[in-house]
Amino acid sequence: MAVIQITSDDTWQIQADGHPLRGTLQVPGDKSISHRALMLGAMAEGTTQITGLLVGEDTCSTASCFRALGAEISPLNATAVTVQGLGMGRLQEPGDVMNAGNSGTTMRLLLGVLAAQTGRFFTLTGDASLRSRPMARVVTPLLQMGAQIWGRQHHSRAPLAILGQPLEPITYYSPIASAQVKSALLLAALHTEGTTLIREPHRSRDHSERMLQAFGARLSVDEATCTVSLEGPAVLKGQKVIVPGDISSAAFWLVAASIIPDSELLLTNVGVNPTRTGILDVLWAMGAEITLENERLVTGEPVADLRVRSARLKSTRIGGELIPRLIDEIPILAVAAAFAEGVTEIRDAAELRVKESDRLKAVATELQKMGAKVTELSDGLDIQGGGPLQGTHLETYGDHRMAMSLAIAALNAKGTSEIHNASAAAVSYPEFVTVLQQIA
């Protein structure tokens, strides 16, 4: 068995021994769906019941903000959460600054909601990482709708102040495929008189569209043109929401079982929404042995059990319209590439530079420390795979996906690795290291 220890200074020590991974796992609830269930539940009339919610730092930030806005949300847990909604346009003006923590989803989607709360004033901030992340991509189209938003660097950085206004519908051609931009505008459009149309260059994840329709919004999607239209004003009704497991969390185990010989894992109840399954398409292209079992539809979302067995991986190219479907999985795919035969090329991923860390730089730096041959490009990486990695001192940059990706790399490296600032994993997967200790 691998030796995995958690030290008092927020460090994971991982000494690998090549032991195969075996077992059945249930990954935590989908983070994107969990955020949206809390938000729509707070804006809807009546009660929303949520099963399978992710209880992580990001979703706790969303719950905290909406409690400050007057919504009644029961203590967060994965079994059952109840949200007593206030109804459209009835969120209350809080008496203090709201803090989105590290959660870009919380801040960007909240901007769309708050901009439409006529006559009420809000201030929104976050941690140091979030305050450095770009908000203009959401603020700019909201200003076109009539929003009043102020902030640092020409209203592009938090803290941000919002004075709710009567908004107008718009037609917006987004320069990037971003579910956060699209969702913020849809949440604002719920309060307008008329039809808002949003077109993207590629499809982005569509959890907002699916859930808005379930809550009663008049929304249509043209997949051929990557266009969404919403007719406002809307009246949302509370719903029962079952949150599937997060494929972004499952990705770590899919790669781990693929690269560690003689491994086999069954990941149950994982969301396989086609706007999120780029990770599967890439791993299949690399030769991974992954099968979908017990496929079904749960509250409007495709769900399956994923069985993964170890396989000999080969290099591939990742870019173009694939990127929005796996943007969060690129760090762990880079780990897979380090163990694959040949050179894997990642392109069109400049968005990774403005995530919780500069993930292109972080991935290149840390894998190079382990002996991988990685070339950092402006919008991607070239990774020469096939060589053994060596355990060493590694840094997460306070980024949850970096912490877990490096842990999987360390699990198949020679010697001992120390991963510093590892508690960042709690943002999306608080139980990750416990599960790692159990199966490794």
Curated annotation (Swiss-Prot):
Pfam families listed in its UniProt record? EPSP_synthase
Underlying gene:
aroA
Q: Record's superkingdom?
A: Bacteria
Q: What does the annotation say about its assembly with partners?
A: Monomer.
Keyword line:
Amino-acid biosynthesis, Aromatic amino acid biosynthesis, Cytoplasm, Transferase
GO terms (molecular function) for this protein are: 3-phosphoshikimate 1-carboxyvinyltransferase activity
What exactly does this protein do? Catalyzes the transfer of the enolpyruvyl moiety of phosphoenolpyruvate (PEP) to the 5-hydroxyl of shikimate-3-phosphate (S3P) to produce enolpyruvyl shikimate-3-phosphate and inorganic phosphate.
Q: Which GO terms describe its biological process?
A: amino acid biosynthetic process; aromatic amino acid family biosynthetic process; chorismate biosynthetic process
Give the EC number. 2.5.1.19
- Localization per Swiss-Prot or TrEMBL: Cytoplasm
Name the InterPro entries for this protein. Answer: Enolpyruvate_Tfrase_dom, Enolpyruvate_Tfrase_sf, EPSP_synthase, EPSP_synthase_CS, RNA3'P_cycl/enolpyr_Trfase_a/b
Q: State the taxonomy lineage.
A: Bacteria, Bacillati, Cyanobacteriota, Cyanophyceae, Acaryochloridales
Q: What class of enzyme is it?
A: transferase
- Supply one GO CC term from the record: cytoplasm
Main location class: cytoplasm
Q: Where does phosphoenolpyruvate bind?
A: 31, 104, 133, 180, 359, 401
SUPFAM superfamilies, from UniProt? EPT/RTPC-like
Q: What is this protein called?
A: 3-phosphoshikimate 1-carboxyvinyltransferase
Which positions bind 3-phosphoshikimate? 31-32, 36, 178, 180, 328, 355
Tell me the pathway.
Metabolic intermediate biosynthesis; chorismate biosynthesis; chorismate from D-erythrose 4-phosphate and phosphoenolpyruvate: step 6/7
User: Which organism is this protein's natural source?
Assistant: Thermosynechococcus vestitus (strain NIES-2133 / IAM M-273 / BP-1)
